[in-house]
Regions:
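Polytopic transmembrane helical bundles with strong interfacial aromatic enrichment
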Residues: 27-385
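Short, low-complexity intrinsically disordered segments enriched in small and basic residues
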Residues: 1-25
């Protein structure tokens, strides 16, 4: 039986990066879905995007909790009973008394009023409440879709993994908070970075599932595929690096750009022994690494956008430029609350754009990946969209 011919390539106008509907796509895997599952796709996609939006909001609230030094105001982890905030004056005094026992109060906030305590308490409570709400917002629709047969086996497995990651994130959040309740006045930068990075991973994983509901994506097999994947991984790595900057309060120092206090490569990058600890415990090194990785991502995104000539690559480049600008602005202004939150939210937007770019690349037919991204020795023909 003769092989099925590949789809015809569209005309030049349709292949223009900013015109037309773009290149031919790999057919949607409708053969793996029944009629009920096909009909449910818009609702499943909307649900996943809604959960991703909630996670975005939670990351912003988490950033505000950190920047207002509110994260240690609730000294217990009660997944069920802790859902209710203090409702009476006696309950508030009881919560305040627990806070006054920890080092942060005794060494930093000695003499804090009950009103000031309520301010930081509400930030932390809101952050935890959002976590519980997101758990319900994910689980209840998931249970409904599963019970009605609206998800195939692959989606059931993926959603189960996502739900498990959400539970792990809650436990990791408490593990982070617990590090600041004894013998120190802040949380471990290692645990903070892990908590932030896992939030980004869950956010990205949900978007990745939502992006690919209807289409078979190829496995990465070319230079273009690998570069798009590398960009997405670099963004996740940058989020982790940003977590160390936040955990070490590294953004509060060296508030100059493009130099760091007059030096391109500042002295003191390896002040701690052994050298590798500087990556995670030296505020100067953490900020330098965060800057350097930002430059790498910017150059890589610009090169990819030039070679690819696609909408997705252009959007990625623009989000990277915006995020880099926000980062510089935040640094120069010594991390005001609103700018710090914009920069933290911008990181997730860059991740969303990087994953969309990767998704679009893996939806192109292999025969279209013959551009500069695939091999510098070939002709400069480019893949589109």
């Amino acid at each position: 039986m003769p092989a099925e011919p590949l789809p015809q390539e569209p005309g030049a106008a349709a292949l223009h990066p900013l015109k037309g509907r773009g290149a031919a796509r790999i057919p949607a895997p409708m053969d793996s879905l029944n009629a009920r599952q096909i009909a449910a796709l818009p609702y499943v996609r909307g649900w996943l995007f809604a959960v991703a939006l909630l996670i975005f909001c939670m990351v912003i609230v988490g950033g505000a909790t950190r920047l207002t030094d509110s994260g240690l105001s609730i000294t217990e982890w009660q997944p069920l009973l802790g859902a209710m905030p203090p409702l009476t004056e006696a309950h508030w005094l009881e919560a305040f008394e627990k806070y006054r026992r920890i080092p942060e109060y005794q060494l930093v906030n000695k003499g804090m009023s009950l009103g000031d305590f309520k301010f930081i308490y509400w930030w932390e409570w809101t952050h935890r409440f959002l976590g519980r709400f997101i758990g319900l917002a994910f689980f209840l629709p998931f249970a409904y879709f599963a019970a009605t047969g609206s998800l195939n086996r692959k989606m059931l497995l993926r959603c189960t993994v996502l739900f498990a990651l959400g539970g792990l994130q809650g436990a990791l959040g408490w593990y982070m908070v617990s590090s600041g309740l004894v013998d120190r006045v802040d949380v471990s930068q290692y645990r903070l970075s892990a908590h932030l990075t896992l939030a980004a991973v869950i956010f990205g994983a949900i978007l990745w599932v939502a992006y690919g509901l209807e289409r078979n994506r190829r496995m990465p097999s070319s230079g273009a595929d690998g570069m798009a994947l590398l960009l997405a991984l670099l963004v996740v790595l940058q989020v982790a690096a940003g977590g160390f900057v936040a955990g070490l309060d590294a953004g509060m120092g060296y508030n100059t750009w493009p130099l760091m206090d007059g030096e391109l490569v500042p002295r003191g990058l390896l002040a701690i022994e052994p050298w590798w600890r500087n990556l995670f415990e030296n505020a100067l090194t953490a900020q330098f690494d965060h800057r350097l990785l930002a430059y790498v991502i910017l150059v890589a995104a610009a090169g990819f956008a030039y070679a690819a000539q696609t909408r997705a690559a252009l959007i990625l480049l623009l989000t990277v430029l915006l995020q880099a600008s926000l980062g510089i602005w935040t640094l120069l202004w010594q991390v005001p609350l609103w700018l710090g939150l914009l920069h933290q939210g911008g990181a997730l937007l860059v991740l969303a754009a990087a994953l969309w770019n990767l998704h679009m690349v893996l939806n192109l037919l292999p025969k279209q990946l013959t551009g500069k991204c695939q091999s510098p020795t070939r002709s400069p023909a480019r893949y589109r969209r």
